[in-house]
Amino acid sequence: MGAGAAATAIAAPAIAQSSPALKWRLTASWPKSLDTLFGACETFSKFVSEATDGKFQIQTFAAGEIVPGLQVLDAVQNGTVEMGHSAQYYYIGKDPTWALFCAVPFGLNTRQQNAWFQAADGQKLIDEFAATYNTKCLLMGNTGCQMGGWFNKEIKEPGDFRGLKMRIGGWAGKTLGKLGLVAQQIAGGDIYPALEKGTIDAAEWVGPYDDEKLGFYKVAKYYYYPGWWEGGTTNHLIINLPKWNELPKSYQAIVQAAAGYANVEETAAYDARNPGALKRLVANGTQLRPFSQSVMEACLKASNEVNAETSATNPAYKKVLESMEAFKNDEYLWWQVAEYSFDSFMIRARARG
């Protein structure tokens, strides 16, 4: 055997070993009908397959096909599936620190979230925290600033929240609880029937595109803005940590690249689809309403109280919150000079025609 042939024979098993054939499962918190959220999962799995010449296959499952939508973290943590796609504020019952990595009232917007994770402390902090749950988390989508929810009565002042039963995700329910609202955590696909039957009085989900798909305009009249509890909602790819550590470095790099691509695509899709959906909702009779200044101020006060109370008893929460708040404060120095002043002028110019 010649030297070249011998080298090829030796190298072939090594290449095969570094690029093994794998079949993983990914369970999502979303129904397939929400094609932007679930679409991020499909984009991710397709990217991984194509980048590995089909050797690394990831099958995607919608909420309820393997586990309910709110049990994705459990399924990944205990190894029922290798991966999941979810919003971490669903898991505040385990530890409210999870919400800080997703969306909290008066927190970071979309670009600030991406910057905090990718160019500041965010990824390091979530690596430390998620490891205690046997998981690894990567950015994989952001909805942008969300809407403030669907109501069958007007919310003119803070007292109008009192006694309302509202489907609202994450830490916002804790905040509005201080104003007398009764928060309900319900998966996206179950919100419409709950509104229709009167099990809940109000609901928030994402924004115009997804809310239109779920039909909320048929069972609620008033659509409020902004969703101050979700200025930029980060969804994450959640990976079983031992499985992640077993992956070849090349596959880890591909997974990170695929998640990053899906992260950008999800935000772009929402930005492109929401304007048309908002127009259609209004044409169908939806009445847009802004939250009043008094409502916003009362909610900010309640949010600050929740953060102070939680930080006093939860060191992990305090550590992550302090990092996020310091980053946000510096960011808004810059945004006030550049982004905000530019966008404000352009919005006024548009109104003038």
Pin down the residues of each PLM region.
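N-terminal secretory/targeting leader peptides
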Residues: 2-8, 13-113, 121-353
